[in-house]
């Protein structure tokens, strides 16, 4: 998503129960002073990921047609998406009516401005004869066509018959999908340890390429070494601080550190990077007697809610309150 329209400004007196949430809330929202920082952050990131081209690894065939033909046996597409997300293999979901006219060249096919070296077809019993014919042709031209579980039977929508031949391609299991794609060279991000909550987005502009890294884990930080297609001439961009920082590389990879829900952008080329990104470290302090959490209700100046915590914890945890 690269375009946002803030809409939660309400001119009615606060609270207007018919129109939550309220960004400003006539001065009653204690987070409103930080709203400008959030909008600046969103503007910077949105600017970087529009007007260019997304660089995915593979394409997934949209599964609606297979589900309409046989809902009981069709594999939910989100199962495939989850497996790819957890392995840092980026993808686009392509509808069948776009795919059947996609040209093939140099062992890749084109859809819009993007090219793909592989098509993944989630588990289904049937597929239209037109799609089967495209898969057979693309496979013969070097595109990796992967069917999960079993190859679907081709069906002619007009005659409701199953003509032959069956679609070309390779049948792989869901469990073997990730390693199959990696063996085919269709994975550009590799971590030194599994990172199921790490997401990335590779994007190209006329003046260079970037990779967005995001930690989807709401609780745990990510710290690992990541291999990217950029090589050693790279730097970090922090969109919240609007700063460039030289990247810390080691053993052919870059050191990545992300707090929960944090995003950092890796930039090809290190022009403008002034300093090495280093986390601030201090001697640990063990407080005596636990922690006191104070909360000030909206519209007041003094805390009226106090909680005694034996240890410092995630203040956003739903079971804390």
Model-derived features with residue positions:
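Carbohydrate-binding surfaces of carbohydrate-active enzymes
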Residues: 1-321
